[in-house]
Amino acid sequence: MKTKYMLIPLLCALSACSSTETDTSVPEIIPVGEATAPLNCQEYPRGGAIFFDYLFRDDTELGAYNIEIHNNFDHHTHSTEAGECRQDPAKEPVNPWILNKDYPIPAGNTSFEAKLTIPVPADVDPGEYHFMIRLTDRSGWQQLKSVSIRVTDPV
């Protein structure tokens, strides 16, 4: 009888074992040639649109991505791009553009081209903004790409 009860935990332990493969690499955010947008220092008019186009890759499986846009009127930084964009004097926001949205990636993908049309609200404060892309793989590894963009008055 004791053997029977000792066998149950052993079977549970053995069946719970998984592959020894461990995902230790972060996913990649890759520009798509001429189509890539946004890029550092690009300008977008209020009431216009950002045509987002990036390729995401991972060695095992992609998870999801997030787009965040927030003002940079105080000149803080977390850009992952080399080079500085033209800066206006620091200012207080009145009606800043704030966007923070998650997007799923279909299960099983190791490569995914993300294409979105992101409308620029017509009533937001013009000025400097950060456009951040967060890409997470199924294991939880995350890659961040942050570029500076400028919202302008329409011509």
Residue ranges of predicted features:
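First exposed extracellular module after export/assembly in secreted or surface-exposed proteins
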Residues: P27-V155
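C-terminal motif of bacterial Sec signal peptides marking the signal peptidase cleavage site
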Residues: A13-A16
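Exposed boundary/loop context
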Residues: P9-L10, V120
